[in-house]
Regions:
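Structural microenvironment flanking redox-active thiols in thiol-disulfide oxidoreductases
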Residues: 54-118
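Terminal helix/beta-alpha structural elements that buttress the NAD(P)+-binding lobe
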Residues: 21-22, 109, 143
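Sec-dependent N-terminal signal peptides
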Residues: 3-12
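Amphipathic alpha-helical repeat scaffolds
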Residues: 47-51
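Hydrophobic beta-strand anchors of alpha/beta hydrolase catalytic cores
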Residues: 42-44, 75
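Thiol-/selenol-based redox modules, centered on thioredoxin-like
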Residues: 120-172
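A short beta-strand-turn-helix
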Residues: 22-42, 63-68
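Sec/Tat signal peptide C-region and signal peptidase I cleavage site
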Residues: 14-18
Length: 172
């Protein structure tokens, strides 16, 4: 009985059995980003960092969002300091992105993406697929039904056909 109760408590606390679209991110601008609001749409979630060699991919993420947002694509940036390459505060991240990239895609507050303290979204992705970001600018595509449709490392650019083919297949 204690084991059953412990499992139920763990699940209720955002355990590994939560689905990716059942999670909530703090928004870098305040408030929250409810992943459930994106049900029925493809969502590309990318862990980002301001001081990384892949930071130039912000341009590609914005271009991807611009190309497909009217058809329903959501691109969500999740700043993270898990690889020691993010700025010291959410305010600094916002300022950096405003000065260097004309981003208007949704952005979460700085979050953990790996390890025991990973955000529940990343724990859910790991539970479903085994995928854990190994560096900044790793990408996870969530299908409109909420399943993980794909994941890619830093070297796969946002506008890569590997990603865009899957996105296009999910859009009206």
């Amino acid at each position: 009985m204690r084991i059953i109760m412990a499992v139920l408590l763990w699940m209720g606390a955002g355990g590994a059995w939560a689905a990716p679209l059942d999670t909530v991110f703090a928004n870098i601008d305040g408030g929250t980003i409810e992943m459930s609001d994106f049900r029925g749409k493809p969502v590309l979630v990318v862990n980002t960092a301001s001081q990384c060699g892949f930071t130039y991919q912000y341009d590609g993420l914005q271009a991807l969002y611009d190309a497909y947002r009217d058809r329903g694509l959501v691109v969500l940036a999740v700043p993270s300091d898990d690889f020691n390459q993010e700025l010291a505060s959410a305010e600094a991240v916002k300022e950096f992105c405003a000065l260097n990239f004309a981003l208007d895609l949704p952005m979460a507050d700085v979050s953990r993406v790996k390890g025991a303290d990973a955000h529940p979204f990343y724990r859910a992705v790991r539970a479903e697929t085994g995928f854990v970001p190994r560096w900044n600018f790793n990408k996870v595509l969530i299908a409109p039904d909420g399943a993980v449709a794909g994941s890619w490392g830093s070297n796969v650019k946002p506008r890569s056909p590997k990603i865009t083919r899957q996105i296009e297949a999910m859009l009206p």
